[in-house]
């Protein structure tokens, strides 16, 4: 969240009391929407942990999702270099746009977003009836079986690469990625944790 010093340095006069706020998906990086906050809306956002704007049409505060239930849960807030715009990283609950899309800017999602969506689906399957899907049955088989599948798919991926079969390599790599995501979910880990660890190693 914003530090006290950052909050004091925000240039509300420059923006006539309404500061533009860009909301970005905290995991995928997709730009979700643009809104406006006055000081009260910012305070409410920080206090509640849910993105709250000042509606220029209704002339009041409104919590994004107060009607639809599609809230934006705040992860972090940062000012730009001129202190007249805010960037909010958030985890959306449902689609952000009233048209039912993930972003108010249309289909702007990077292909990486699919991995996040797949991860969410795999998390839902974790407690599903094993008879309803392969994934649910895999979870029910236990960690050892899931780990075994990751090992098998890893070997098959490597073998496909050694014979330079790009088509088969793509298929086997897809299977490996899927089973690895299932294993991470089984251990209550996610891609974000892995990515953060890679960032630390890179520094």
Swiss-Prot record:
The keyword Protein biosynthesis does not apply. GO terms for cellular component: cytoplasm. Residues 115-203 are annotated as: Phosphoribosyl-ATP pyrophosphohydrolase. It catalyses: 1-(5-phospho-beta-D-ribosyl)-ATP + H2O = 1-(5-phospho-beta-D-ribosyl)-5'-AMP + diphosphate + H(+); 1-(5-phospho-beta-D-ribosyl)-5'-AMP + H2O = 1-(5-phospho-beta-D-ribosyl)-5-[(5-phospho-beta-D-ribosylamino)methylideneamino]imidazole-4-carboxamide. The keyword Amino-acid biosynthesis applies. In the N-terminal section; belongs to the PRA-CH family. This is Histidine biosynthesis bifunctional protein HisIE. It comes from Shigella flexneri. The lineage of its organism: Bacteria, Pseudomonadati, Pseudomonadota, Gammaproteobacteria, Enterobacterales. The gene is hisI.
């Amino acid at each position: 969240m914003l530090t006290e010093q950052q909050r004091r340095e925000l240039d509300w006069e420059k923006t006539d009391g309404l500061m533009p706020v860009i909301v970005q998906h905290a995991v995928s990086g997709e730009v979700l929407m643009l809104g406006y906050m006055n000081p009260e809306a910012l305070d409410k956002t920080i206090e509640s942990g849910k993105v709250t704007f000042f509606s220029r049409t209704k002339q009041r505060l409104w919590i994004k999702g107060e009607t639809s239930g599609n809230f934006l849960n705040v992860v972090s807030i940062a000012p730009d270099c001129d202190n007249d715009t805010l960037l909010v990283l958030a985890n959306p609950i449902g689609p952000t746009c009233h048209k039912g899309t993930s972003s108010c800017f249309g289909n702007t999602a990077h292909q990486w977003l699919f991995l996040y969506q797949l991860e969410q689906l795999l998390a839902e399957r974790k407690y599903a009836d094993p008879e309803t899907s392969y994934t649910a049955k895999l979870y029910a088989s236990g960690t050892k079986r899931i780990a075994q599948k990751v090992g098998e798919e890893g070997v098959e991926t490597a073998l496909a690469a050694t014979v330079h079969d790009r088509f088969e390599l793509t298929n086997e790599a897809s299977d490996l990625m899927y089973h690895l995501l299932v294993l991470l979910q089984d251990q209550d880990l996610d891609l974000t944790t892995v990515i953060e660890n890679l960032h630390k190693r890179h520094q």
